[in-house]
């Protein structure tokens, strides 16, 4: 029986839904990449304001015989706007299930015609817009994609013959209302590393928002 397994790279223990945990002091290059000028520049241009890092995940999907959950077409939760960055860690093709989405404008038609609630079958979506509208993210390891998964109807990996491994970043606006998946545990990272760069420190604002008495590395070391 296959499925999707996520490692929350911003959580420092196993109290979240994540299958794993990480100390970013051991892997500073991950956060350096997430808040690099190139990445933040794209997110800022789309969102129209300073982007805030909401997620950093590593997803592994193992082969499955039938579609479940996010293998069906859906929209992400109704945030006003968000932007996700996906990078293939290994080559992606039809055998390990490409991330598949429909651009924002035809996705609006899907939302209206299907009267969207929850998940949708391929048949429901393609009755609203032609199947030719879909875009499949395939290619060699290192290839990357940006998509607003709140506005673009999409589905995750339908791996059939081999595993798929993807690295994901989520960027939201400073007024994002939902609690991040790492809210109840501190994110262990070197806060001093980013303090001199105003854009980076703002992008990492959620990492220090924890219940009283908890916080990022800089709060207790």
Question: Could you tell me what each predicted segment is?
Answer:
Residues 56-58, 104, 149-151:
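Short, well-ordered beta-to-alpha junction loops that form the rim of enzyme active sites
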Residues 84, 99, 164-166:
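Structural motif
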Residues 1-71:
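Non-heme Fe(II)-dependent double-stranded beta-helix
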Residues 49-52, 75-78, 88-98, 104-107:
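Active-site region of the double-stranded beta-helix
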Residues 78-94, 138-139, 146, 170-173:
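Short, conserved beta-strand element in jelly-roll/cupin
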Residues 70-77, 152-156:
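Histidine-centered catalytic micro-motifs
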Residues 108-221:
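Conserved double-stranded beta-helix
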């Amino acid at each position: 029986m296959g499925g999707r397994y996520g490692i929350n790279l911003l959580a420092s223990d196993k109290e979240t839904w994540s299958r794993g945990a990480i100390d970013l002091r051991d892997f500073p290059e991950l956060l350096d990449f997430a808040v690099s000028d190139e990445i933040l520049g794209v997110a800022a241009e789309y969102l129209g304001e300073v982007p805030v890092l909401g997620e950093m995940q590593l997803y592994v999907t193992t082969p499955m015989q039938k579609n479940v959950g996010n293998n069906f077409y859906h929209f992400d939760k109704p945030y006003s706007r968000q932007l996700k960055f996906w990078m293939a860690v290994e080559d992606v093709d039809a055998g390990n299930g490409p991330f598949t989405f429909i651009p924002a404008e035809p996705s609006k038609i899907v939302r209206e015609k299907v009267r969207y609630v929850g998940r949708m079958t391929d048949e429901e979506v393609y009755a609203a817009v032609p199947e030719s509208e879909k875009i499949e993210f395939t290619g060699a390891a290192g290839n990357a994609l940006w998509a607003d998964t709140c506005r673009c109807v999409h589905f995750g990996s339908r791996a059939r013959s081999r595993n798929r491994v993807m690295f994901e970043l989520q960027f939201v606006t400073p007024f994002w209302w939902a609690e991040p998946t790492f809210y109840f545990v501190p994110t262990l990272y070197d806060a001093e590393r980013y303090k001199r760069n105003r854009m980076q420190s703002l992008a990492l604002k959620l990492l220090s928002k924890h219940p009283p008495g908890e916080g990022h590395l800089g709060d207790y070391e």
